[in-house]
Amino acid sequence: MPAPFPEDSVGLVTPQLFHFDQPLALANGRSLDSYELMVETYGELNAEKSNGILICHALSGSHHVAGYHSEDDKKPGWWEHYVGPGKPIDTNRFYVVCMNNIGGCHGSTGPQSINPATGKPWGSSFPFLRVRDWVETQVRLADRLGINQWAAVVGGSLGGMQAMRWALEHPNRLRHCVVIASAMNLTAQNIAFNETARQAIQSDPNFFNGDYLAQSTLPKRGLSVARMIGHITYLSDDGMGKKFGRELRSGSFDRGNDQLVEFQIESYLRYQGSTFSEVFDANTYILMTRALDYFDLAREYNGDAAEAFKQASCKFLVVSFTSDWRFAPERSREIVTALMRANRDVVYGEIDSVHGHDAFLVPNQLRYWELFSAYMNRVEV
């Protein structure tokens, strides 16, 4: 009987739930008395516990990076193309860890969870978070796993922000920091996109100020529109043009035809929004986008990014994509310039791609694969 999964996949994986009773002091002054983290791991931790790789997920990501949850599972983890045997993050060499961040909606403690103080879902009362709060929970997970130092901390987009925060706040606990399609802070335009998405959610009559679960409803329409807005910014004009152009899904422009015309891109966006609203939580979306907005790596260093990076002692890989206008290459070059001014070891790659911000997730990009693989092969275990 043939194997149910591709040979270069990690195959069947089972998430693990870790419970923490130690109170977590948050950056906003509030705290969580206890919390849970949903985690997946791939590969084997070596005897020295020196081959650990932490992957930090982005806005809509989760702990499910690679592999399948059942033999009938048709959709692998979100980074399946880059994590597994013989892939850039090679599970034959590395012990790979990813957790669903707190505030998430894939098993870790978040707005959908029951608040032990009330016995009801947290909803709107769940505290807003900062990137450093996620890093603190990741540190505690590393301690639980017995990993004193990661071989590398890796992340794309919001995940890259977490990786950089690791490098500054826990410099002795990672040897390499891989930052893909990210930035040291958001531009005004980026914040504007996030606020527009939040307004779409909050304008849904089923939002109920974030306490929709208490009303036994969900703001699916608002979340769907928010996802449509976000998804447009993750693509590129060239990429959308090549994939959809002005092709029609229905109707025509023939004279005398008054049927409503639907473009392929319209149908695609509605599908993306609808499917996302079935699996993601609106409060989590608001929380995650605010964490993005609030992040500023150099804020505590008087805006001097080089001074901030002087706190780091690891080596860096920074990657950008030419068509990414949400986290444009110049934002990655700002990171590289600051690292060089701080006299830190950095490799930079700018990849030609039509896939926009989502390029860091997209398979079959040879130069990206080669750069990523070459760097990770240098990571000592």
From Swiss-Prot:
Pfam families: Abhydrolase_1. One of its GO terms (molecular function) is homoserine O-succinyltransferase activity. One of its GO terms (biological process) is methionine biosynthetic process. It is found in: Cytoplasm. Substrate binds at residues 227, 358. This is Homoserine O-succinyltransferase. Transfers a succinyl group from succinyl-CoA to L-homoserine, forming succinyl-L-homoserine. It comes from Saccharophagus degradans (strain 2-40 / ATCC 43961 / DSM 17024). Its main location: cytoplasm. Belongs to the AB hydrolase superfamily. MetX family.
